[in-house]
């Protein structure tokens, strides 16, 4: 147990710029196709580029040269973007903690302005004025039903305070606003749109607020989408989900004196429910997108139609032959349009002959983005094109359309595999960087055959796809065909457990899986039907064990050598039950098949070897076979939820112990995935190596091996804004890959080994460990640590003697527990054993001796690496106490049911609903379970904590008296109170609201 006030965990995942240079983002696959108005056409006379957001990164993509410029800086997913053609600037914003609003130079990709926390929770939507001077932002609220939105106007290029006005919405509006748009003729006016209401805003002079009003005469049952201002006109148009537009105009009726002119709905026009051409697209016709391009109102619909109308709402042109899904954006190039005098086919002459005096339809090239993750380029001439194939336009990008489940890089190639929730399995060449993915297979999601993890074998010959229904599909990468027989981890037809992880052995001949039923299974490639006379080989099931009684967190193969120096494989699993299970992988000698009377068990090749508890208070999260093997050791590396990395040594006599415990990276949460970064050098026992890791969300990083407990030998950065599903790397370690989930993104990173070494290089004259203490090297904690160590030296030399003592700067290992407790860290007996073994066997395998003493530096390393990162607080004690009371309650009910045949609910909660336990029950638990105390030790501790007076000892123990009266903890965890209680309005849905 360890109570600590000031030691904090850095969950930001942010490192120095030099550390980020060690992992450079080189390419990002995918884009946020669901973000309305998120993609912009940057094409002009000098460039052919588009901008789109990917997770928390902006991308300027040159579709002519297939290159990317990456705009990095956001730590949350980008939720709003805008582009100003006049100023050639891009605006991006995100929502979440540490949100930002960034203005980028579109020609260079360099940020021109960064505004931190434009709103407390970031931006829902934004727009930029026609001249690029002003930005308007809508806040994103955590609870869209109860929280009040705000709207801000920014003059972003001001050197001082850029925010001009911030205004909260009137609670009576009762409609969350999703969209905002400037009036292109007047940058003091803009409109916001929700599902049922539109609000018009105007800034008057330099006053500190807005005039706004929300018209109430919206046609019933209309769900609104977007709003645009008609140029050189007072009319405004709002789209609806049923294919209509609502036309707003200045009201001619003055309702009361001094009421400003306000827009009212003057008509409802059906634009999309009737096709304007015989073979037009049918189906749902929601108006998703409204744009103004020159003299046209442009509409993009949910059925993939693009239509151009004049400002009398008469159709001029339509594009309905391209294979386009529900549209999320339309964006036009910034190129001057010069109408040809005559087409190649003489079309203009034909128009004149027919007496058509209307100007010919013309517009810049434009891109269309749909919800099928496709970006299509269209040209205005396609409207009059007769060839159906040519009318489909040019596909610039066809990307990932479903959340990513898993990703893996194929060794000895430039291909990565990606599987998604919709059952699609893709392959993508990261050297060619194609904008269109290659589909390897589509799994039938109706049969719950959705892939859950994919992995290539180390030799690159096999691809294993494990599904949520317990099936394993094997793909032969050389022959380009799937194995006919499908492997299964369970024969029970009623419930097929989901395969959560799979791993190949280093020789690519064994495949191990762990599933949701807490079982570990083994498959191997062997002769069909295990008949040596059949030359064909296939993957087959050869063993299974269900040892864990809780979720398995990770599995790993290890390599060892027997007495004959022959290599064999062992398999390890770690689980939420805090246990490590070791299995031996048996090999079959087919020469015995011919021996008379010899019976061979071809199936049972996974032999249970040992079960060992590796944690007491925290859950292990990942494991990997330790690749550093200078002394021919067998070592497994594990990590846990408390940010600790442990090395477990396996001796020849099946003896195992914790060789070392190190503080791991503490940014971004606990590590849940590990891999060797430079796998080509994995067999080199002496070369420095690197472990790549990922946390459950946001952070990936690198750990330098061998582990020394040096905090300078780890780095991490924000790779994704949310969940990370997979990490992988190329065999040479030069490319590292990470995949998100519903950000539809795979990031390709280049690894700079030289930069890594510069990062991890430690000044020999600088001790990094004191910096991990509160106050650093000159702080009180470091001084206390030295004082307690020196006092331990005196005690070890007999503190009561009057003779001169000769201190040699070392203390015996038996002094470790008292020194740790004096520093406020109360280790368990097992933790004490681990610390003593770490010192005792630190030199054992080199000269063959055991170390029985430690110096000050050793003690400092032990303390910073073993103590809990987060101290024990009242909430954690309450959680533990509730666990005990629940356990007692369940036990009492079970006893009562057995004795009387009925359930009895024992009293384990007081009148305030706080879990409590009697003093006698607490004593029984502490003296009979876990690391047991004796009765005398319990009584002695209670007297020390509560005093000699037995009346001061409470007979019922709850979290309050245990923490405050017995343990003397300070209440460091303040409770949050919401004192901001505002009145609620209950107004009619169509009531109008004004503010002057």
From Swiss-Prot:
Gene3D superfamilies in the cross-refs: EF-hand (1.10.238.10), YVTN repeat-like/Quinoprotein amine dehydrogenase (2.130.10.10)
InterPro entries for this protein: EF-hand-dom_pair (IPR011992), Quinoprotein_ADH-like_sf (IPR011047), WD40/YVTN_repeat-like_dom_sf (IPR015943), WD40_repeat_CS (IPR019775), WD40_repeat_dom_sf (IPR036322), WD40_rpt (IPR001680), WD_repeat_EMAP (IPR050630)
GO CC annotation: 9+2 motile cilium
Originating species: Tetrahymena thermophila (strain SB210)
GO biological process, one term: cilium organization
Protein task: As component of a spoke-associated complex, regulates ciliary mobility by mediating a stable and functional assembly of the radial spoke 3 (RS3).
Highest taxon, organism lineage: Eukaryota
Keyword annotations: Cell projection, Repeat, WD repeat
Gene: CFAP251
Compartments, record wording: Cell projection, Cilium
Protein name: Cilia- and flagella-associated protein 251
SUPFAM superfamilies assigned to the protein according to its UniProt record, in alphabetical order: EF-hand, Quinoprotein alcohol dehydrogenase-like, WD40 repeat-like
Region (Disordered): 971-996
UniProt key word Ribosomal protein: no
Gene ablation phenotype (knockout): Knockout cells show deficiencies in cell multiplication and ciliary functions. Mutants move with greatly reduced velocities, have disturbed waveform of beating cilia and have stiffer cilia. Mutant cilia lacjk an arch-like density of the radial spoke 3 base.
WD repeat segments: 73-114, 118-164, 168-211, 219-258, 282-319, 399-438, 445-485, 494-533, 547-593, 615-658, 719-759
